[in-house]
Amino acid sequence: MKRLSDTSSAITHTNKSGIASFRNDQARLSLAFTDDAGTTRMTERSHFGPLRVQKTLYPEHPAVCHAIIVHPPGGIVGGDQLTITARVGDRAHALLTTPGAGKWYRANGQLSQQQVSLEVGADAALEWLPQETIFFNEADVRLEHNVTLAADARYIGGEILCFGRTASGETFDSGRVAQRTSIRRGGKLLWFEQGALQARSTSMHSPLSLAGYTVCATLIAVGKTMNGAFLNELREESSALAQGGRSGATQMKQVLVARYLGHSSETARLWMTRAWQRIRPELMQRDAVIPRIWNT
């Protein structure tokens, strides 16, 4: 059995009181998961700065390792750079999530960035299911998400993007969010999406982007071509949960994309959870066991 390696490093500085503290402008986290006779174990966990794994859990089966990624400062400000890398070895299965919403604050003239790189081996599975992301006024954000899958690997990736907090009366009146996502399987590019949204621009209201809504949830599943009956049921159930927003699902060969547009992060969370509960058993042959952290 390969043992867990856990390394960490950090940059500190001394404030006027002589107390050392983190400079959290850069943070990196690297994880690896390995199959050990039917049990998925985290065999690498290295971090630089305030990105960490809180704990690993097995709420459903030893074959599926749930890991909670934590960014202790609680929010990202201008100049911060987060890099997350995860590798899931052959036959292993990992689910990665976060303990709460990710918050991107005012840029102060500096770009904030997050780069996620995920690699999944043969007959392995990965679920990337962070909780919602909130962009506050004057945020300047660039997000990059790259997934590399073996020819028979399976993947579910979800995200909820909130532009402002409408429930608190906080709108996204200034700022910019750029995003790029790519998914490859067996060396072939299956999915590529990129775009940039500028607050108050026409792109925020385009039917090709947010269509005037402030919350966007996307769930992508790779690894199986769903039949027509399943897709119709998914569309009907998802639309019923949209509550005044919009919902849809599209199958492109072995890539299923489901999306919600609305004004409620709470509705988006419910929509995402239900869509995942519907898709996961079909793709992963496992019932959807909700991560415990989602209920806290």
UniProtKB/Swiss-Prot annotation:
One of its GO terms (cellular component) is cytoplasm. The keyword Cell cycle does not apply. It is found in: Cytoplasm. It comes from Janthinobacterium sp. (strain Marseille) (Minibacterium massiliensis). The gene is ureD. Belongs to the UreD family. It comes from the Bacteria. GO terms for molecular function: nickel cation binding. This is Urease accessory protein UreD. InterPro entries: UreD (IPR002669). Its main location: cytoplasm.
